[in-house]
Amino acid sequence: MALFEAVEVTKQFANHLALDKVSVSIPEQSIFGLLGPNGAGKTTLIRIINQITGPDSGTLWLNGQKLKPQDVVQIGYLPEERGLYKKMKVGEQILYFAQLKGLSKAEAYKRTKYWFKKLEIIDWWDKKVEELSKGMQQKAQFVSTILHEPKLLIFDEPFSGFDPVNASVIKNEILFLRERGATVLFSTHNMSSVEELCDDISLINRARVILQGRVDEIRNT
């Protein structure tokens, strides 16, 4: 069963066609790779899923229902342009975002502590974001993305800026989240990450889907 579906989604900005009747289907509890070069349309599709912008035509479905604005709480989004407030303390900021997504203060605190310990950033709780390395900041934003345990997780180039050790840590956590029931969409141009993680892929180029299917089947064709 598909957790998320986009059916013939089209989006145009002025004279630029960003998406041309794009359809994707993401199976529940899977890791789905959205591949393509810069400007292919990947980020536009992600923004439409997150209700940052709307399609000109086409339909989006989440869990068998048409996607509605209030469904955004069921989505966790890690954008390529990271967005933590530099002057705010790390722990305080993650708690704030968690409560915006519907968690009680006590539950937000418990989950944040768990993930900070797991990712070995607990010592940075009271540090300002600007005091953290880029990798540490990305770990903190990763925690913010997953903390409310959304049905659909969207990661846009999640490994950019990580050294190989920390990239491996995050890859393992993404696999762990899938085992716990999450459905993951991640956008990348890195084929090796796709082969390591993804069950299914969709390749977008010049606003259109040009290849889609199971990774193991595509690899063997």
Tell me the role of every PLM-derived stretch.
Residues 1:
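Flanking scaffold residues of small Cys/His-coordinated metal-binding clusters
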Residues 216-221:
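Short acidic-hydrophobic catalytic motif
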